[in-house]
């Protein structure tokens, strides 16, 4: 259970890379990856995300049996900004949860894949790990943080992997 999120994330990336009509690409050198993502991730010297001090007033930790590691935190940051998680490579989590707006969206309804609109305003995504709410989304349809992370990818309007209208389904 400890490595479940990492395994799901890797599996999801592998699955998404197989969902293409394009020719197979060759491996990209590490330097090219750094240039594409505009960051300098050094796997041997990761930031210390796992051991952050937490204020005493915070009593809840939504990570449960899936503790945060530096590797998982870096993977999460990369996936959060990765537009290839949408069916048409135009939308990432950060498209709606914009850092400049407190990880929320300045519009009433966010824009999803193929120019479509979502039905709701994107919720703010700050410290969901320590949220005192027991469920996620406006309608509380996600019982766990892991479900909250994967649901938008499978939504027809948000990121498109819904299984509707001939689209692939990740579920």
Model regions: which residues?
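Bacterial N-terminal signal peptides that target proteins for export
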Residues: 1-8
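Bacterial N-terminal signal peptides
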Residues: 8-17
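Periplasmic c-type cytochrome electron-transfer domains
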Residues: 19-171
């Amino acid at each position: 259970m400890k490595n479940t999120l990492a395994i799901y994330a890797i599996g999801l990336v592998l699955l998404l890379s197989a969902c293409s009509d394009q020719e197979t690409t060759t491996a990209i050198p590490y330097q090219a990856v750094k240039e594409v993502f505009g960051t300098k991730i050094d796997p041997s010297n990761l930031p210390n995300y796992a051991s952050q001090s937490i204020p005493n007033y915070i009593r809840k930790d939504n990570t449960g049996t899936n503790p945060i590691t530096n590797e998982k935190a870096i993977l999460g940051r990369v996936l959060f900004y990765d537009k290839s998680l949408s069916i048409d490579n135009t939308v990432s989590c950060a498209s709606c949860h914009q850092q400049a707006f407190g990880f929320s969206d300045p519009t009433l309804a966010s824009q999803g894949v193929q120019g479509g609109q979502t039905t709701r305003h994107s919720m703010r995504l700050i410290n969901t790990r320590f949220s005192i709410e027991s469920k996620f989304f406006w309608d509380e349809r996600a019982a766990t943080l892991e479900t909250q992370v994967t649901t938008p990818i499978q939504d027809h309007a948000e990121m498109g992997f819904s299984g509707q209208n001939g689209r692939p389904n990740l579920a």
